[in-house]
Structures are given as structure tokens and as C-alpha cells.
């Protein structure tokens, strides 16, 4: 995106409007297109949204309510989030049908993965019974390290046959 500040309505604006019970703008005001891909921009406003969501009743459904009218317009809606587990990510999981779990093969990766799977299970039970795990995607794997190999092996040994493990990895090759 050439100039994010020029975007009049971002997902942050939409979520703030939802929190404040304001009417949402029409699709044309916030859906942008580039190279045949439609998207809703983000901005730093999401930091303020995250803080406000913590004080809001029914906060975990805000994003779901925004995206619901778009479900019939698209074959798939991809929600890209930061690797944290705050109110915004809970919203993303509450709105999703499937989640691809990205795992950076580092020392605490398995612990984080186990915790995240527990969170998915809770969200499925309490908020979104459609949610399922599409698979695990290993990312940022430094093929030169034994740690990467060990964690990759642990993920396979622990989850193979239960959860799909995507074959592609982002390799770090430094000269």
C-alpha cells in the first residue's frame, strides 16, 4: 500500500464503530482492491481498539459481526493477525471457520503451540463452534540449526495424524 494514511476507513475504524454502536459504512468505503485481491486495510488504530475491547461486553464477536455480511461475497476471507493472543486475535478466532497455526521453531514453540490449541478448543466450545484447525505451518526455520530440526520433529511426532502439518517452511539461509 503506497500511503496507508490515505485510506479513509480501516478495520480499526470499523471495529471502533462497532464498539460505539455506530452505523458501519458501505462496503465500497472500506474494501479496497489490488491485483485482483480485495482487502480491508489495517492501521495503528487497532492498538486503541484492542484496549477498548477489553472493557466491552461481547467483545469477542465484534469482528465476526463486521465480516458476517461479507461471507456471501467471497469464497474465502483471510484474517492475518500478529502472533499474540490478545483481544484482537480472540476476535479473529471467533470470526474464523478455520485457523492455520504458524509455528516458529524456537525453544518455547511446543509450549506455545499447546497453549494456543487449548485456546482454540475453548473458543470452539464457548464462542465459535465452527472453528477448526486447518493445520500447522512451520515458519522462519533456520535449516542450519539442530533446534529447527528438533522442533520440526517434535511437531511431527506430536501432531501427525491429528492435525495436518503443511510441508512448506520458510527457510533462513545466511551466507
Tell me the role of every PLM-derived stretch.
Residues 1-175:
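P-loop NTP-binding core
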Amino acid at each position: 500500500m503506497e500511503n496507508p494514511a490515505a485510506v479513509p476507513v480501516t478495520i480499526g475504524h470499523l471495529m471502533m464503530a462497532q464498539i460505539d454502536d455506530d452505523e458501519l459504512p458501505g462496503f465500497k468505503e472500506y474494501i479496497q482492491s489490488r491485483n485482483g485481491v480485495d482487502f480491508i486495510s489495517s492501521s495503528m488504530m487497532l492498538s486503541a481498539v484492542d484496549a477498548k475491547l477489553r472493557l466491552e461486553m461481547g467483545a469477542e464477536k465484534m469482528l465476526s459481526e463486521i465480516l458476517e455480511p461479507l461471507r456471501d461475497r467471497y469464497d474465502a476471507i483471510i484474517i492475518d493477525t500478529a502472533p499474540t493472543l490478545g483481544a484482537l486475535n480472540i476476535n479473529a478466532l471467533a470470526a474464523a471457520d478455520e485457523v492455520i497455526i504458524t509455528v516458529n521453531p524456537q525453544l518455547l514453540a511446543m509450549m506455545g503451540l499447546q497453549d494456543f490449541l487449548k485456546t482454540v478448543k475453548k473458543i470452539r466450545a464457548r464462542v465459535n463452534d465452527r472453528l477448526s484447525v486447518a493445520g500447522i505451518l512451520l515458519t522462519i526455520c533456520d535449516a542450519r540449526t539442530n533446534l529447527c530440526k528438533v522442533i520440526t520433529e517434535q511437531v511431527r511426532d506430536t501432531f501427525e495424524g491429528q492435525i495436518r502439518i503443511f510441508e512448506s517452511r520458510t527457510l533462513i539461509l545466511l551466507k
